[in-house]
Regions:
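Aromatic-lined carbohydrate-recognition surfaces of secreted/lumenal glycan-active proteins
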Residues: 112-129, 179-201
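Carbohydrate-binding surface patches
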Residues: 269-272, 277-279, 324-364
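N-terminal module-boundary/linker segments of secreted carbohydrate-active enzymes
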Residues: 23-54, 59, 178-179, 187-189, ...
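Aromatic-lined carbohydrate-binding/catalytic grooves of carbohydrate-active enzymes
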Residues: 56-161
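Glycan-recognition surfaces
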Residues: 137, 183-184, 188-281
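Fungal secretory targeting signals
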Residues: 1-25
Length: 435
């Protein structure tokens, strides 16, 4: 969110040295798949009211965004009054949000879930009441208003001798409160942590939440997109059903991102199985940017019902593997999907480039097989790949997204006898080695 300071790579470098250990995911009946929807912060910050929120939901229906899966509309910071009531309740702004229950009723009637925002400290990042020491009371208030989703920020942290907890314990307080609310009311919230990647959240986030921020706030420019992709590349193992890395809300339609950069942004977020929260003004979005958000072949990977895991790098490309470089992140990625192996290639250069890989560099490709190639952006079937694939003339900061489907045995008699990594140990049954 909102005013989250830039804590680039804080704790991420530690993660390079040890892969994330998997924790038991919070399987509480909601949040199995990445949330898709809208959050108002990137476009409007504090300049929001209930009319804008409903108008946004209506645009989402008219533009077909609800039809392709964007079914959440979430408030961010600045919806509250600056002071609590005499009995301690948090109070919505009487001018801009005079009736929260009416707002959520309207969103639900339109077919959307409704999301709200709070903070784990004394105040939100914009200076409104935080939920520290009011966790259960606020959670019950949010439930009574009809909300389904809670984004929880990291500002205004109490003194150590007051909180006597680290980041994990601070967020556990609200997780416990949400559990109590579920037991009392039957309402289970999707819980989204906005703790900026602090305290190696990829090791523990899944024990209490459905998503967790891995870095500081995103910006609508390429250097921010590249930096976040770099941070994510080392911790992809943490993502699965019910719990996932969150690289922050989408900036498609904002700032000076080119069309190709916006495609790369969306592709990376979607194929990493991140939440997809639109963050631009839908009243002025271009048809080109809208087409990116509505790419159903990319969305299908994000919402895969069989595999909940993220794509991961199999080769860094420009840099040696495992290089932490915020400007030139990993370029060659792959992952599993219901319908085949997913490949993502990112040209991190400022000029067009050809991008080549051996198929078996991906762990999900079988040796000795050929693969039908589906381009997820041109929506075309592009022949059959045998042993390798080259994407020609990839645009600066551009992306190629492919779905490779097994198409049977490769042609007989191909040399070398073993391709890729296996070539260094290629051995006949009689022990003869072939290099």
């Amino acid at each position: 969110m909102s005013m989250c300071s830039s804590f680039k790579a804080l704790g991420i470098a530690v993660g390079i040295l040890s892969a994330p250990s998997l924790v038991t995911a919070l399987q509480n009946g909601v949040g199995k798949l990445p949330v898709m929807g809208y959050n108002a912060w990137n476009a409007f910050e504090c300049n929001v009211n209930d009319t804008l929120i409903i108008q946004t939901a209506q645009y989402m229906k008219v533009y077909g965004l609800l039809d392709v899966g964007y079914n959440h509309v979430n408030l961010d910071d600045c919806w509250a009054m600056k002071n609590r009531s005499s009995t301690g309740e948090v109070v919505s702004d009487t001018i801009r949000f005079p009736d929260m229950k009416n707002l959520t009723d309207q969103l639900h009637a339109l077919g959307f879930y409704a999301g709200i925002y709070s903070d784990s400290g004394w105040f939100t990042c914009a200076g409104y009441p935080g939920s520290f020491m009011y966790e259960e009371q606020d959670a019950l208030t949010f439930q009574s208003w009809g909300f389904d989703f809670l984004k929880y920020d990291n500002c205004a942290i109490p003194f150590d001798d007051v909180i006597r907890e680290g980041v994990v314990g601070k967020y556990q307080r609200m997780a416990d409160a949400l559990t109590v609310v579920a037991e009392k009311t039957g309402t289970t919230f999707v819980f989204s942590l906005c703790q900026w990647g602090w305290s190696q959240v990829w090791l523990w986030g899944a024990s209490m939440a459905h998503s967790w921020r891995i870095d500081g706030d995103i910006g609508p420019y390429w250097s921010s997109i590249a930096s976040i992709i770099n941070s994510a590349s080392f911790i992809t193992q943490a993502t699965n059903y019910y719990g996932r890395n969150d690289p922050d809300m989408l900036e498609i339609g904002n700032g000076d991102l080119t069309y190709d950069e916006a495609k790369t942004h969306f592709t990376a977020w979607a194929l990493m199985k991140a939440p997809l929260l639109i963050g631009t003004s839908l009243a002025s979005i271009s048809s080109q940017m809208l087409s990116i958000l509505k790419n159903t072949e990319i969305i299908a990977i994000n919402q895969d019902p069989v595999y909940g895991t993220s794509i991961s790098p199999f080769r860094w490309g420009i840099n040696p593997d495992w290089t932490f470089n915020a400007s030139f992140p990993a370029q060659y990625w792959s992952g599993q999907s219901e319908n085949g192996t997913v490949i993502m290639l990112i040209n991190t250069l400022d000029e067009p480039a050809d991008m080549f890989f051996n198929l078996t560099e991906s762990p999900w490709i079988r040796a000795g097989r050929q693969y039908a190639v589906r381009d997820l952006w041109t929506h075309t079937s592009n022949g059959t790949a045998v042993r390798s694939f080259t994407a020609a003339d990839v645009a600066p900061h551009g992306v190629v997204a492919l779905l490779l489907q097994d198409a049977g045995d490769e042609p007989a008699g191909l040399l070398p006898l073993c391709a890729g990594e296996a070539s260094t140990q290629c051995t006949a049954e009689n022990g003869t080695k072939y290099y």
